[in-house]
Amino acid sequence: MPSDDQMLLIRNYDLWCNLSDEDYKDLNIEHHFIEVPKGEYIYFEAYNHNKIYFVKEGYIRIGYIDAAGNEKVKEIIQKGELFGQFTLEKNNLHGEFAQAYKHDVSICAFRIEDFEKLLKKRPDLALRYSKQVGAKLRTIENRLLNLLNKDVKTRLTHFFWQLVEQKLGENQPEGFCIPNYLKHEDIANLIGSSRQTITTMINELETDGILSFNRQQICFLNVKKLQKLVSVN
C-alpha cells in the first residue's frame, strides 16, 4: 500500500488526525504495517518488547497463560485502540500475549523511542494520548474494583453497561445494537467467572427483555432497565 494511503487510513482516527507529513515519517509507520491472519500471535511472552500497536481493523485478544497452562483473556482490543507498551515502559508485558481474534486484523506498529520523540515535539498529541491512556487505566481500575467488591451478576451488568456507554454500532429497529466479538467464555474471563454461570445469567437478561445475545450482535432492548440494575448495584 502506498504511504499516502497508509497516512490517510491512520488519520481517520482522533489520536492521529492532526499528524503532519513530517510527524508521520518520524514514526516510521510506513515500514510497520502488518496484516495478521486470524489466530496468529502478534507477540507472545513479550519480555523484550519496545513497540506500541494501533488497530486499524479487527479485534485483538490480550491475555496470559495461567499456572495450569490455560490461556486467560484479560482484554479485547478494538479498531482505533492501542495495545502493547502503551505506558511507554519497556519490558512490562511479562507473560502477556496478543492474538488476532475473530477475523484477520490490520495493525501498525512503531517503536517507543520514536513515539516519545514525537510526543515531546507535539504537546497536543501528548495530551490526547495521556487522556486515552488515563481512560484505559480507569477501565482497568474499575474492573479490578468490581472483581473485589461485586458479585458476578453485578459485574456482568456493569460489563454490559460499559459496552452501552462506548456507543458502538447503530440504533436498530429492535434497539441499540453492537457487533458481537465476544463469546460467553471471553466475558467469563474478563469479569472473573465461569462460562456456565455467564450463560445462565445472559439467558436471564434475555428472558427479562433487557438484551439479546447472539454470535453476530448484542442488542440492548431496554437500556433504562439495564441502567437501573447498574445504579442499584
Mark where each language-model region is.
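Phosphate-/nucleic-acid-contacting segments
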Residues: 165-233
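Glycine- and acidic-residue-biased ligand/ion/polar-headgroup-sensing regions
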Residues: 39, 50-63, 79-80
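Short alpha-helix-to-loop micro-motif enriched in aromatics/charged/Gly
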Residues: 67-74
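Cyclic nucleotide-binding regulatory module and flanking cytosolic helices
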Residues: 1-38, 82, 87-88
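Polybasic "coupling" helices that flank or enter modular domains
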Residues: 124-190
